[in-house]
Amino acid sequence: MASSNLIKQLQERGLIAQVTDEEALAERLAQGPIALYCGFDPTADSLHLGHLVPLLCLKRFQLSGHKPVALVGGATGLIGDPSFKATERKLNTSETVGEWVEKIRRQVSPFLDFDCGKNSAIAANNYDWFGNMNVLDFLRDIGKHFSVNQMISKEAVKQRLNRDDVGISFTEFSYNLLQGYDFASLNKQHDVELQIGGSDQWGNITSGIDLTRRMNQKQVYGLTVPLITKSDGTKFGKTEGGAIWLDASKTSPYKFYQFWINTADADVYRFLKFFTFMSLENIDALEEEDKNSGKAPRAQYVLAEDVTRMVHGEAGLEAARRITQSLFSGALQDMTQDDFAQLAQDGMPIIELENSADLQQALVSAELVPSRGQARTMISSNAVTINGEKQANPEYIFSASDRLFDRYTLLRRGKKHYCLICWKA
């Protein structure tokens, strides 16, 4: 992605929501590499899919020769960003936030290159400059540059200010000053000239631009990526089970892969532009191929494989593929113990049973049927499989050979209704 027309290429991919002084930024990028940053607050012990677009945007800039700074908010995470939030955030302990900072730092690292010469990435933590700052310095050196009149007019906090039942605390109200100072501090330390973030960060970004101009007498820029929505208007990155996390212990690679496989046709080519590094020409060619093939589209598989590989590595992708293929074919011999652990984590409904359980009881406990009578009917009609093998004996009692890895049994009714039995020790 050539640096000289990077802004234009990001726009063509639909990756720019707002940008300050677009013409001046494009000119600055044409002059040579810049340093830019994106902040990630530790509001949980993992990033989620909503963080992926700005994180990949950092990577796009680095691939074009620019120097990315990944800022983890060890200080701002203690305060909480009120932007477009209906209620006050719960304040977490400094110990908890410190642990989350390290987890998120490790999570961000594989996406960027920290050893590639002049544009090697930098990892930063804003606790480094806020941790020892006293309140008088904060008010005198930072607070004096902020107009309360302007702060209360920002869209990000307006809804809270207009509500009598919730309001906004001074703690959260001060967040805007903290993030603004991040920009000024990074500009001074690393000559950072651009901040990128989600579209909900526009107010915080413009505050940082103004503060940097006042404190450092430097012109800097801001760019936001759009809030990703699905074509049906629902939130992207959420399932009935909650958020899709980047941490494999919170969302398994299998579930992560399946999330992308289930992308709607109306969204998939747009998501390829947002979440992969495929060229626009190749995405357009894939869309044309899918339209004319008369078969199920390939795009979802391309998307799922690219993003799963990027987040979980080749081993994570292979496991997700292996589980998917095994469940589709009913042949479980290729599945590993770790694969079954992924299914038990979040891949399908699970139940725990005693070793003496029979098949009828298992079907009822798994809520695959409402009653033992219905279970008998289903079993007798060859609609039930155990570990991929049909079982037609309604009086069947599980044996040791049914317990894969001495722990798991996969139960299926019909073609799509699964349950994983985890046998009690």
Swiss-Prot record:
**Residue stretches spanning the membrane:** none
Provide the alphabetized UniProt keywords.
Answer: Aminoacyl-tRNA synthetase, ATP-binding, Cytoplasm, Ligase, Nucleotide-binding, Protein biosynthesis, RNA-binding
As annotated in the record, motif 'HIGH' region runs over 42-51
GO biological process terms, alphabetically, are:
tyrosyl-tRNA aminoacylation
- Per the UniProt record, which EC number(s) apply here? 6.1.1.1
- The record lists L-tyrosine as bound by Y37, Y175, Q179
Q: What NCBIfam families does the database record attribute to this sequence?
A: tyrS (TIGR00234)
Question: What protein name does the entry list?
Answer: Tyrosine--tRNA ligase
Q: Which taxonomic lineage does the organism of this UniProt entry have?
A: Bacteria, Pseudomonadati, Pseudomonadota, Gammaproteobacteria, Enterobacterales
Q: Gene name?
A: tyrS
